[in-house]
Swiss-Prot record:
The keyword Mitochondrion does not apply. Residues 260-347 are annotated as: Alpha C-terminal domain (alpha-CTD). Homodimer. The RNAP catalytic core consists of 2 alpha, 1 beta, 1 beta' and 1 omega subunit. When a sigma factor is associated with the core the holoenzyme is formed, which can initiate transcription. The N-terminal domain is essential for RNAP assembly and basal transcription, whereas the C-terminal domain is involved in interaction with transcriptional regulators and with upstream promoter elements. Its EC number is 2.7.7.6. DNA-dependent RNA polymerase catalyzes the transcription of DNA into RNA using the four ribonucleoside triphosphates as substrates. The gene is rpoA. One of its GO terms (biological process) is DNA-templated transcription. Residues 1-243 are annotated as: Alpha N-terminal domain (alpha-NTD). Keywords: DNA-directed RNA polymerase, Nucleotidyltransferase, Transcription, Transferase. Pfam families: RNA_pol_A_bac, RNA_pol_A_CTD, RNA_pol_L. This is DNA-directed RNA polymerase subunit alpha. The lineage of its organism: Bacteria, Pseudomonadati, Thermodesulfobacteriota, Desulfovibrionia, Desulfovibrionales.
Length: 347
């Protein structure tokens, strides 16, 4: 559909004729709280790779998470030393601390303590947390005491995104003995995607995107992909330089209630469509134009024996009436009955 907007002519078919996935399905048989397998289809050829690559990059780099950013160990002046009575040197202890996964419900820095006094293994579960912080992998090894000595760790936790080197943290104390840590804040541990062939009606030249997401448990895989999609949407929307509400719809995506399009009350038989298209609509129990326009293109393509040729034919007819697929018509049945009564009264 060509619509004039100011001194420009906007061709809405640039996007309206593309197939769009109606929803994302989750494979419940293999998914859990830390792993999700999602299927998105159908997509235009090549779009699965484009979307999958963008989602993967954002998932791994841009989501907020919590991590230790600094530690102070009793009796330790710097990272390149050893601790009497501890099997690991300080460098190894620091590396182990970086592997501890945390969940935090506040943006304010939190200060935790780990205190031990008996020989044996020290794990992340020994950290004394508070109401704002949770250790997600309590079995993560930190150090091993070979003697009964008292050892204290003072730990600072912050929220952030991506990977932040130790010297890039802002506002940390410069006191002697405070060891700054490289922090991997991302709650997403791994992302993989594959592209397969999808079918729409009789056509098979479409894409299916299969996206797999592994998280540390601080965010669900479902929320992780939702956040990444929101980030991408917000970043690219600035490129749209025209009013998106240009297809005869108001801001709610509904038919304009000021001038109700009476073409909506037409019978399918009045459209002079091909026999094949008409029969397909009737087999789908679509009798009126108002019922037809509320269907999405994807819904129509799933109708038995309904193909791209019939879709294009119907879209052209609807366009001539100032209508299109995917139009929300609030209270259509009520309006149709009122219109029928009015027609009968005038007759």
């Amino acid at each position: 559909m060509l619509i004039k907007q100011g001194d420009r002519l906007i061709n809405t078919r640039n996007w309206s004729e593309l197939v769009k996935p109606e929803q994302i399905s989750r494979d419940g048989e293999v998914s859990d709280t830390m792993y999700g397998k999602f299927v998105c289809e159908p997509l235009e050829r090549g779009y699965a790779t484009t979307i999958g690559n963008a989602m993967r990059r954002v998932l791994l780099s841009s989501l907020q998470g919590a991590a230790f950013v600094a530690v102070k160990i009793s009796g330790v002046q710097h990272e390149f030393t050893t601790i009497p009575g501890v099997l690991e040197d300080v460098t190894d202890v620091v590396l182990n601390l970086k592997q501890v996964r945390l969940a935090m419900d506040t943006e304010e820095p939190q200060y935790l303590e780990l205190k031990v006094d008996k020989r044996g293994a020290i794990t992340a579960g020994d950290v004394r947390t508070n109401q704002h912080v949770m250790v997600l992998n309590p079995d993560q090894h930190i150090a091993t005491l070979t003697e009964d000595i008292e050892l204290t760790f003072e730990l600072e936790v912050r929220m952030g995104k991506g990977y932040v080197p130790a010297d890039m943290h802002e506002g940390l104390s410069e006191e002697i003995g405070l060891i700054k840590l490289d922090a991997s804040f991302s709650p997403v541990r791994k992302v993989a995607y594959t592209v397969e062939q999808a079918r729409v009606g009789q056509m098979t030249n479409y894409d299916k995107l299969i996206l797999e997401v592994w998280t540390d448990g601080s965010v669900s895989p479902e929320d992780a992909i939702a956040y990444s999609a929101k980030i991408i949407k917000d970043q690219i929307s600035v490129f749209i330089n025209f009013d998106e509400r240009i297809s005869g719809e108001n801001s709610n995506g509904s038919a304009d209630s000021g001038e109700f399009n009476e073409h909506l009350f037409k019978s399918i038989d009045e459209l002079e469509l091909s026999v094949r298209a008409t029969n397909c609509l009737k087999s789908a129990n679509i009798a009126l134009v108002g019922e037809l326009v509320q269907k999405s293109e994807n819904e129509m393509l799933k109708t038995k024996n309904f193909g791209r040729k019939s879709l294009d034919e119907i879209r052209r007819v609807l366009g001539d009436m100032g209508l299109d697929f995917g139009t929300k018509v609030d209270g259509f049945e009520k309006k149709y009955q009122e219109w029928k009564r009015k027609q009968q009264h005038e007759a």
